[in-house]
């Protein structure tokens, strides 16, 4: 079977987001997972920023991974991927000028779409990690991303977190990002369909929801009816791989019992030690949450 070009895959993604259906992402974190996802019939994959940090650094999701490290992993995936891959590009790795560089590098890596979020990252001295940048700065980042794009088929989605801001502010943000020219809007933190209807008021571009498996949002037909074209449930495949690796190596070492009763979440916590980063943030950055 002939290999699809990067532009072919970008066109495929645009066809998905132009349809009347809602598609669910496969978590892809390396070339093998991308191959498996395509073979199993997934229409779209996503390289999560948190997963890239775990895969490349064995570090928690504290915006520690650099653009170069993220792009290297995206390039490895893009070399073999036969399904469109979305890159969770976090905050674009800096200001609007950094966003332009991010877009250039991820486009060359073969990514079909990317998201740029308005979270204030990395965490700032004396500021909460859940703070958002101003809407004006977020608009500037989206405009910069569009300016930097060479292939018009690559999609650029603006992302915001509706869980930590009032509904009216969320509405204002997504409407302004749409007006800035974003190809789509990614929303985190939607509670239920009523909340989705409020926040997406006036939005005509495709929606991407990051639900983390929220049971209140499991009606796929209703998601599609409300303009959601991509749904991200999380990265279960990656965490299952961590668990399987641990259990396999544990068995090889002939440790009593073929499987441990440690969950993937517990294993991830054990090997990344996020509490260390929280303490360092308190100690060196005056961040107390």
Swiss-Prot record:
Key words, A-Z: Decarboxylase, Lyase, Magnesium, Metal-binding
Signal peptide limits: none
Enzyme class: lyase
Pfam families found in the cross-reference section: PEP_mutase
Residue positions binding Mg(2+): 88
EC number: 4.1.1.112
Cofactor note: Binds 1 Mg(2+) ion per subunit.
Cofactor dependency: Mg(2+)
Gene3D superfamilies (UniProt xref): Phosphoenolpyruvate-binding domains (3.20.20.60)
List of residues binding substrate: 50, 159, 235
Keyword check for Transmembrane helix: no
GO molecular function: magnesium ion binding; methylisocitrate lyase activity; oxaloacetate decarboxylase activity
Disulphides: none
SUPFAM superfamilies to which the protein is assigned, alphabetical: Phosphoenolpyruvate/pyruvate domain
Role according to the record: Catalyzes the decarboxylation of oxaloacetate into pyruvate. Seems to play a role in maintaining cellular concentrations of bicarbonate and pyruvate.
Name this polypeptide is given: Oxaloacetate decarboxylase
């Amino acid at each position: 079977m002939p290999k699809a070009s990067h532009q072919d895959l970008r066109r495929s993604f645009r066809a998905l987001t132009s349809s009347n259906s809602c598609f669910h992402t496969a978590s892809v974190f390396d070339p093998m997972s991308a191959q498996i996802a395509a073979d199993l019939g997934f229409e779209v994959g996503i390289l999560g920023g948190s997963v890239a940090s775990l895969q490349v650094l064995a570090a928690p999701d504290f915006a520690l991974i650099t653009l170069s490290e993220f792009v290297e992993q995206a390039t490895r995936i893009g070399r073999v991927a036969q399904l469109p891959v979305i890159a969770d590009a976090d905050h674009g790795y800096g200001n609007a000028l950094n966003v332009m560089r991010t877009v250039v590098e991820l486009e060359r890596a073969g990514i079909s779409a990317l998201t740029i979020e308005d979270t204030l990252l990395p965490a700032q001295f004396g500021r909460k990690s859940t703070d958002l940048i101003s809407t004006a700065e977020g608009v500037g980042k989206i405009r910069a991303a569009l300016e930097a794009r060479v292939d018009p088929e690559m999609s650029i989605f603006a992302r915001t977190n509706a869980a930590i801001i009032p509904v009216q502010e969320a509405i204002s943000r997504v409407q302004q990002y749409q007006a800035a020219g974003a190809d789509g809007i990614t929303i985190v933190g939607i509670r239920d369909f009523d909340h989705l209807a409020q926040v997406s008021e006036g939005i005509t571009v495709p929606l991407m929801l990051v639900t983390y498996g929220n049971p209140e949002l499991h009606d796929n037909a209703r998601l599609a009816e409300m303009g959601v074209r991509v749904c991200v449930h999380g990265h279960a495949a990656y965490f299952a791989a961590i668990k399987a690796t641990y259990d396999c190596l544990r068995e090889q070492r002939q440790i009593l019992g073929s499987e441990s009763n440690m969950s993937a979440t517990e294993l991830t916590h054990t090997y990344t030690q996020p509490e260390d980063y929280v303490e360092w943030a308190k100690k060196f950055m005056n961040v107390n949450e």
